[in-house]
Amino acid sequence: RMIRVALVGYTNVGKSTIMNLLSKSEAFAENKLFATLDTTVRKVVIDNLPFLLADTVGFIRKLPTDLVDSFKSTLDEVREADLLLHVVDISHPDFEEQINVVENTLNDLGCADKPSMIVFNKIDNYSWTEKEEDDLTPATKENITLDELKRTWMARLNENCMFISAKEKENIDEFRETIYKKVRELHVQKYPYNDFLYEVE
């Protein structure tokens, strides 16, 4: 009886890299569309707390028909999950649109109300353009610094977002700690009589 956590997100946002990092295994992390074609589930332990982590097929706007079957197994994992980690490639120019695609897909699956957290990945790749002081044109999204983005999203989502680089292992300790807290909270609600939760820390 373990809490099930699913990594969801647009294709090519770094879900498999995060999976490898958390489970210290080598899921197929490759920079291309649909490198993960079936759902990989692993047992992960953080501070003696075990849970199941599923890496799922990336969502996209229009799914090619030959991938629909692979996608169905992903959807089952998503439906069964207790917690969704929505991974976003913050360095992608259209990341906000990708967030919408994923959220709409989750909505279509009836999973919009599940506990979830947005994980902004690839902060090491994020780039922005500083405006010249005498440039009076309105700032565009290319002019937003990472700190400004963080403030905006933190204000919008409170504690429900993290900014990491799975590849460069930036902010990974805090990421693990946040997952631990969320999984533990869900575990206490779902399986209140599990002994290992009450061991002396």
Where are these regions (language model features)?
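Conserved G1/Walker A P-loop phosphate-binding module
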Residues: 1-79, 83
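C-terminal-of-GTPase-core extension/linker across diverse P-loop GTPases
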Residues: 1-13, 19-20, 24, 93, ...
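Generic enzyme active-site microenvironment
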Residues: 53, 87, 119
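Conserved Walker B
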Residues: 56-57, 63, 90-91, 122-123
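Inter-motif core of Ras-like GTPase G domains
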Residues: 67-92, 104-111, 165
